[in-house]
């Protein structure tokens, strides 16, 4: 019994409160009050906001369009491309005849019209507005000529950097982020900058033998002023968050100099320095400023000569199409008379497989061996650029050939606008890195740029259409359906059975034609 009593724990007393003030401290025991019981709140029902999807459906009757859309199981006829990609076509057996009309081409882009009008106002002339496109001419300088050109590239970059430093010293953009308007009018003027930097320019010219032309150095000052102005406009319009114009590094990959048309004489430029110059095309009929570019990777000297293309009439067909860019096929084209599928993604993967293997190997070497020599690093980086250039050249070849064919067959093209920037961002964890790489190689944004340029050149209107609900909407009845990962769109209300990409291409065409139809 005594052992059992020993194991029992003694009772712990309540907390003590010590009252001070007198010499003797009195110990007072205070009992804790039980907590007040609060009335229980009734559970509040959370209301979930429901948003109705805005329908993009346009009926076939409104656009005078047929209900025709091919079934997924069909036999395509292949089109010769003279390149690495595939181009297949399926024709509508009940297609209507296409009307033709004459159109004067090329069409001058609105941005070019605006720039030419501003130039006419500034120079107080009435020059006609023309379509300008650049022509590439490769030159083959000798070793002595290459040495002279390399020094000229270096001096051009030095003059550009010194002019930008001078403009920055005048505090055009304040530390608070505000722009000093009075300073921009005075400083961002090439004549005032030229006067201020006359001594620096003359010293740079005297430092070389044979000396560089003064007008070429003046072009560097003019280029710096124009680049500064464009950076300011981008900052004002909110396209750039922080104003920052960086100077050129002398050892950069691509170097340029700007040459005036007066220096081109006798199938060469600057005949006092370069009496003879080999070129891929004759250097004649040059009446505008030309830029000479040197690429250190390819070791090529290329002249970009602006040419005016004269206007002429072309027989165009009244035929419009919708294009859905995607990952199964690069492009899916729909028109009332035919559908086309251009370059399946499997072919892109197979053609770029070897290049990406070598790129991954080089990247692994750079990551695993950080303490490499500078020469070794330069070689590895040059190899990276080489294999990336091969991939871009393949895509460039496909872009130009596809856009040329589309522009010649259709008079209006409605293409879906993909937000590739948000898809390729690090925040997007849904897509895998392999899919992101495929999207990056296809480069849809560059394709749309090239297609619009070709459209202006050959008289075809190109419209960018938002892809909102184009895949989910039935092109026949307008019912919205979640497809998920299925490749076929099967409508439950009207019974339409078609390929999902072709259905999306038809919806893109309808949305693109909607404002055009209302204007008519």
From Swiss-Prot:
InterPro entries, sorted = Cas12f1-like_TNB, Recombinase/Transposase-rel, Transposase, Transposase_put_HTH
Q: Which residues bind Zn(2+)?
A: 474, 477, 491, 494
The entry lists its GO molecular-function terms as:
DNA binding; metal ion binding
Region of interest (Disordered), residue spans: 23-44
Q: Looking at the keywords, is Cytoplasm present? A: no
Q: Which keywords does this chain's UniProt record carry?
A: DNA recombination, DNA-binding, Metal-binding, Transposition, Zinc
Provide the GO biological process annotations. DNA recombination; transposition
* Any single Pfam family the record assigns to this protein: HTH_OrfB_IS605
What family classification does the UniProt entry report for this protein? In the central section; belongs to the transposase 2 family.
Query: NCBIfam families of this UniProt entry?
Result: guided_TnpB, IS200/IS605 family accessory protein TnpB-like domain
- The protein in question is named TnpB-like protein L770
Organism of provenance = Acanthamoeba polyphaga mimivirus (APMV)
The root-end lineage is:
Viruses, Varidnaviria, Bamfordvirae, Nucleocytoviricota, Megaviricetes
């Amino acid at each position: 019994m005594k052992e059992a009593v020993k194991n029992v724990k003694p009772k712990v007393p309540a907390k003590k409160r010590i009252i001070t003030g007198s010499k003797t401290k009195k110990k007072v025991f205070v009992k804790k009050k039980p907590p007040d019981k609060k009335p229980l709140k009734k559970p509040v029902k959370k209301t979930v906001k429901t948003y109705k999807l805005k329908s993009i459906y346009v009926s076939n009757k409104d656009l005078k369009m047929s209900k025709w859309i091919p079934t997924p199981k069909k036999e395509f006829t292949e089109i010769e491309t003279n390149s690495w990609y595939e181009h297949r076509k399926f024709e509508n057996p009940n297609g209507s005849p296409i009307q033709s009309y004459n159109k004067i081409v090329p069409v001058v882009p609105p941005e070019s019209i605006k720039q030419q009008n501003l130039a006419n106002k500034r120079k107080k002339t009435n020059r006609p507005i023309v379509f300008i496109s650049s022509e590439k001419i490769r030159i083959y300088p000798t070793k002595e000529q290459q040495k002279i050109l390399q020094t000229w590239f270096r001096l051009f970059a030095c003059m550009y950097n010194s002019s930008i430093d001078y403009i920055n010293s005048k505090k055009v953009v304040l530390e608070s982020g505000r722009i000093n308007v009075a300073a921009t009018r005075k400083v961002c003027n090439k004549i005032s900058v030229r006067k201020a930097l006359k001594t620096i320019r003359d010293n740079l010219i005297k430092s070389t033998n044979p000396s560089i032309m003064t007008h070429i150095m003046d072009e560097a000052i003019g280029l710096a002023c124009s680049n500064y102005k464009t950076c300011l406009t981008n900052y004002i319009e909110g396209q750039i968050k922080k104003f920052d114009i960086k100077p050129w590094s002398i050892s950069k990959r691509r170097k340029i100099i700007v040459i005036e048309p007066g220096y081109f004489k006798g199938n060469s430029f600057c005949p006092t320095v370069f009496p003879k110059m080999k070129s891929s095309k004759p250097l004649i009929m040059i009446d505008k400023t030309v830029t000479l570019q040197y690429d250190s990777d390819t070791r090529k000297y290329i002249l970009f000569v602006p040419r005016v293309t004269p206007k002429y009439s072309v027989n165009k067909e009244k035929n419009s199409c919708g294009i859905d860019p995607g990952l199964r096929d690069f492009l899916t084209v729909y028109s009332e008379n035919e559908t086309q599928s251009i370059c399946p993604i499997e072919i892109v993967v197979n053609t770029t497989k070897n290049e990406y293997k070598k790129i991954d190997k080089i990247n692994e070497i750079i990551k695993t061996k950080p303490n490499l020599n500078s020469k070794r690093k330069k070689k590895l980086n040059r190899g990276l650029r080489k294999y990336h250039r091969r991939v871009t050249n393949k895509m460039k070849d496909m872009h130009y050939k596809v856009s040329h064919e589309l522009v010649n067959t259709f008079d209006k093209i409605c293409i879906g606008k993909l937000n590739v920037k948000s898809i390729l961002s690090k925040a997007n964890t849904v897509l895998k890195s392999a899919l992101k790489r495929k999207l990056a190689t296809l480069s849809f944004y560059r394709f749309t740029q090239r297609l619009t340029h070709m459209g202006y050149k050959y008289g075809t209107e190109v419209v960018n259409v938002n892809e909102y609900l184009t895949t989910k909407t039935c092109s026949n009845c307008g019912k919205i359906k979640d497809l998920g990962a299925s490749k076929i769109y099967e409508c439950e209300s009207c019974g339409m059975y078609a390929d999902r990409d072709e259905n999306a291409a038809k919806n893109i065409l309808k949305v693109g034609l909607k404002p055009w139809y209302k204007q008519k």
